Amino acid sequence: MNTNPIGANKTNETANNTWNENSAAEWFAKKEWKNGLLLEPHETTNKIIFAEQYHKNKTAWDKAFKFLGGNLEAKEPGKYEIDGDDVYAIITDQPSKEPEMAKWEAHEKFIDIQYVIKGEEKIGITPLSTATVSKPYDEANDYANYEAEGKSYTAKPGTFFLFFPDDVHRPNILVKGFEVVKKVVIKVRVAE
């Protein structure tokens, strides 16, 4: 019998929304959320926000990670519905951009899971608090562009990136020798 009034999938910790650096790191390290996913999250993942979002909408995240763990190399470029309008994926197979052509962006309604299926690219990351809006938020397309300085990381098969609304990111930056990159961006609606 379920005596937890919040629900069987919620722990007291998550029901009380008391995630902190230690509790989130402990939960993250257990990797139960991966459900067998062989890929690894990038070191830049905000564990507190991820723990909060995952526990607010476990079903959506589990579906997203199931898709991410599938045979993505066999999928054609295009949009894939995963869970209605709340979780979907876009697979691209296209040239990367010179750094000056890649734009800083952030989203309000959706969290990005970005994963390079084939090839390599650089991705810039910086906190929203350090960026200046260069193109105001476009609600229909859920993005704003920014002027920013940030740290760049190499994205390649085996590791995925998570970008929350406070993460300004600049994907699709060219790595010499990998001019064309196949990647997936899975959009997971932000849980309130």
PLM regions and their residue ranges:
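Mid-length scaffold segments of soluble, non-membrane domains
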Residues: 73-135
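A short hydrophobic beta-strand segment most commonly corresponding to one strand
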Residues: 160-162, 178-192
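Generic beta-strand structural signal
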Residues: 109-113, 121, 151, 159, ...
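Conserved metal-binding segment of the jelly-roll/cupin
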Residues: 154-172
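Short proline/glycine-enriched turn/loop segments at secondary-structure junctions
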Residues: 173-177
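Bacterial Sec-dependent N-terminal signal peptides
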Residues: 1-19
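A short, N-terminal "cap"/entry segment at the start of jelly-roll beta-barrel domains
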Residues: 11, 21-91, 101
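A short beta-strand-loop-beta hairpin characteristic of the jelly-roll/cupin
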Residues: 121-155
